[in-house]
Amino acid sequence: AASDVYKRQVDTAIILKAVLDKDIGLRDAKLLSHVALFEVPGFDRLLLVTDAAMSIAPDLEAKKEIIRNAVKVANAIGAENPVVACLCAIEKVNPKMPATVDAAALVDAAKSGEITGCTVIGPLALDNAISVEAAKRKGIADPNAGHADVLLMPNIETGNALYKALVILAGASTASLIVGAKAPVIITSRADSEQTKINSIVLALATAAKKGENN
């Protein structure tokens, strides 16, 4: 069986069609999602961002699957109980802002055991998710605020913008995968650097190896 899939110059749609084929495909989980790993200069830990490329406007159930997929990658890089922050514009639930409602529901899902292997926090703005000092200044009581290992995006626009901001403005090194298949799928952009492509292969191998340990 395949341990990882790399698209090279093949069109992304062709790769995904093959992965999702009901008879010969590699689909494993309920949903395929994109997970990006960043090493940001000056930041004290690796950071995972999901989903910046696959899930356009995920609903609550899709977000649960996106978290489960991201946890598998987090485990592969050594984060055994990652903190997953549900990113929003504010820190309080506002019915007019659906992402905050979903965030609260995802926190409850983790507390009830529906989502396992991680701690889910939110709703949180980006600064309070990754900076302890910012969380303290805002008076956020959650002890995990500022300690996020995984950033859950409310939609693809937010994820895409954050991905490019980290790479272009912050000079981050990155790797990315499609997760949720029987093997991690490497779908990099033709604009990505050679180092990003190499990083993605290494991350795919680590994720596949961790999956093998758990099977």
Positions of predicted regions on the chain:
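C-terminal functional extensions of proteins
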Residues: V150, E157-T158, L162-A165, G171-N215
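Flexible, glycine/charged-enriched surface loops at secondary-structure junctions
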Residues: G78-V84, G113-P123, K210-N215
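Glycine-rich beta-alpha junction loops
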Residues: R8, M54, C88-V93, L124-N128, ...
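Short Gly/Thr/Asp-enriched flexible loops that form oxyanion-binding sites at enzyme active sites
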Residues: V10-L26, P98-T100, Y163-A172
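Active-site rim loops that border cofactor/substrate pockets in soluble metabolic enzymes
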Residues: A89-V150
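Short, small-residue-biased leader/transition segments that mark boundaries at the very start
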Residues: A1-Y6
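Short, glycine-/small-residue-rich phosphate/pyrophosphate-handling segment
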Residues: F38, G42-I77, P98, D192-N215
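Short, acidic/small-residue loops that bind anionic groups at enzyme active sites
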Residues: K17-A53, T119-I121, A172-S189
